[in-house]
Amino acid sequence: MQYFFSFAMSFLLMSIYAIACAVATFIENDFGISAAKALIYNNAWFDMLHLLLGLNLIGVIFYNKLFQKKKYSILLLHLSFIVILIGAGLTRYFGLEGGMHIRENQSSSTIVTREEFLKITDFDTNASFEFPISFTPLTQKHFEKTIDLNGEKLIISSIKYTPQKDSITPASLKLNINYQKANTQIILNPNFTNKQVVHFNLQGKNFTINWGPKEIKLPFALHLKDFILERYLGSMSPSSYTSKIQIIDKQNNIELDYDIFMNNVLDYGGYRFFQSSYDQDEKGTILSVNKDPGKIPTYIGYTLLILGFLWVLFDKNSRFHRLSI
């Protein structure tokens, strides 16, 4: 136990963490953010690494009595890492990434997540169940999920995933579904509007299933008053595009006009809206949406980290100061 709460273990865990982040960067560059999340960021072993590193840093503080005045600079460094880890945890488990599509003179209060889900609904009870799934060029794992329906098990297992070949042939997912010893096989295509579902019947019970993102309702709406696209002189290439929107928050009796364009984002209600793309007829906008409750703790952690390093450099009790004498 004493070795686990040592500076040597801290160095080892931080080295593993740094290597994992570096590998994730290369994976993201070559295969996309979804592959990096599936293999590194959202993987159970990376969560465990966060936990071990946090416990190690807390243990080091107490085992080495860093609360002493002469060790305050080292204490600040350790506390900064702990705050950064807390911020990362908040982002991991409570953060949200998605998009919002709005046509001119229309309003939307719905975010469509980037993460894809498999959603199944029992018509008899109107109960719905959903769980995230992810298929990337590097992660095409078999999965099996069991759902309890009043004591009876509904088992959904993947058989084969076929990635998208071109713009005409979409990706497909072949599933086997078992209920009360009855089986059926279903082929799904990703459904990004959540309006198309597949119906099936097992042992007299009716179900629907679909594969696509989750829709999240916001407590406020955005109304697109106008979308403006500007082009380079003598060219059809867009130089900039702006979404002139109105925030409609009935709960707080707020109506506020705002322009969203490149490098000018909207922060409202804990969400951040970026200008992402637009419809081909130039009558609609596509906004990227981000909710990151770990952003502020992470910024605080990095600020403390910088202050801690500066303090260590000039602290008379630090090893750096003694070596410089």
Where are these regions (language model features)?
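Hydrophobic alpha-helical segments
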Residues: M1-Y41
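Intrinsically disordered or highly flexible coil/loop and linker segments, enriched in small
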Residues: S6, S10, E28, F67, ...
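Soluble non-transmembrane domains of integral membrane proteins
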Residues: G99-D292
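Hydrophobic alpha-helical segments with strong N-terminal bias
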Residues: A8, I27, F31, N64, ...
